[in-house]
C-alpha cells in the first residue's frame, strides 16, 4: 500500500451499532423492477411489498447519485468489471438526505446508466440483476435490515453508443490533468498511520482465528468448512500485509477526498478498478481510532473494510451486500465471503471477544 503523504498529481490511478439483541429484522422487503430506457440507460422501480412503512438508508442503493454498484452485469455468465466506487458509511447520526421512507405499496424510481460504471463498448447482450440488503433506520440509526431483489433483465448493448458515455475512469483522467492537492500531513497523516497499524493487527488476528473456525466465524460466514476458513483467512492475511507497508503494495491510499466522491455520512471509499482508497473528513472527526464496543465502527475496521474492496489486495475484491451486524449476519455463505463488512465486523469480534 502506497501511503500518499505528500500527494502529487491526481493521475494515479462512532458510532456503535445496536447490539444483536436490540436489532430487528424486517419480514418485509423491497421489490426492484428493472427495465431498459434506451441502450444502457436503465430504470429501476423500487416498491415496498410489506405491510408497514419502512425507512432505510439508500446509500449504495437506488437513489444514490454517486457512481455506486446498483446492479450486477453479466456477459456469458461472467460478471463485467465494476469501475465505480464502493464505500463505507456511518450507521448512526444519519442525515435526512440519505434516508428514504416508503409506505406499504409505495415506490420510487431511479434512472442510471450502466455504461458509466462498466466498460460496455464491446456491445452485445448483457444480463443485469440486483439483490442484497439495505439498512433499516429508526431515529437516524441503523436498527435492522431489509432485503431486496430484482427481476433479471437482458438487453442488447450498442457498443458504439455505450462508448460515448463518460465513465468514472474518464472523469479521473480529466482530474489528473488539471488538479493538484495539498499534502497529507499533521494529525491526519498520524491518524491514518495509526489506523494502518491497527488494521494490520486486527486482520492478522482475525486471519489466525479464521483458520481455526468456530462459532464466531460461522456467525459471520455461515460455514465452518475448510474451504471457507481458508478463503477468509487468505483475504485477511492479504489485508494485514497491505496495511503493513506505506511505501509498497498494490493500493494507493489518500488521506483526503482527492476525487470528490465523499458525501454526507461517507467514511471512506474505494475505486476497486484502480486500487485507490480515500478517506473522507468524518473518518477523522467521527470515528475513534479503535473502538471498545462490539460491532461498532472505527478507523481501523473502516480501513480494513476498504482494503477488502481492492482486488489488488486480494482478488476478487468484495462488494457491499450488507452493512452492520444484522445485515451481514443475514447473508448466505457465498454472499458473506463477498461482503466487505463481514470481514470488518469479524475482525472487531475477534479482537474484542464478542
UniProtKB/Swiss-Prot annotation:
Signal peptide segment:
1-19
Secreted as a keyword of this entry, yes or no, is yes
Q: How is the cofactor bound?
A: Binds 1 zinc ion per subunit.
Q: Name one GO molecular function term.
A: metal ion binding
Which family is this sequence assigned to?
Belongs to the peptidase M35 family.
Q: Please describe what this protein does.
A: Secreted metalloproteinase that allows assimilation of proteinaceous substrates. Shows high activities on basic nuclear substrates such as histone and protamine.
Q: Which UniProt keywords apply?
A: Cleavage on pair of basic residues, Disulfide bond, Hydrolase, Metal-binding, Metalloprotease, Protease, Secreted, Signal, Zinc, Zymogen
Q: What is its main location?
A: secreted
In this chain, Zn(2+) is annotated as bound at 305, 309, 320
GO cellular component, alphabetical, reads: extracellular region
Q: What is its EC number?
A: 3.4.24.39
Look up the record and name the cofactor or cofactors this protein needs: Zn(2+)
In this protein, the active site sits at: 306
Detail the disulphide connectivity of this chain as listed in its UniProt entry: 184-255, 262-280
Identification of the protein by name: Neutral protease 2 homolog AN7962
The reply to whether Disulfide bond figures as a keyword in the UniProt entry is yes
Phylogenetic placement of the source organism: Eukaryota, Fungi, Dikarya, Ascomycota, Pezizomycotina
- What does the UniProt entry say about where the protein is found? Secreted
Q: Which residues form the propeptide?
A: 20-178
Q: Which reaction does it catalyse?
A: Preferential cleavage of bonds with hydrophobic residues in P1'. Also 3-Asn-|-Gln-4 and 8-Gly-|-Ser-9 bonds in insulin B chain
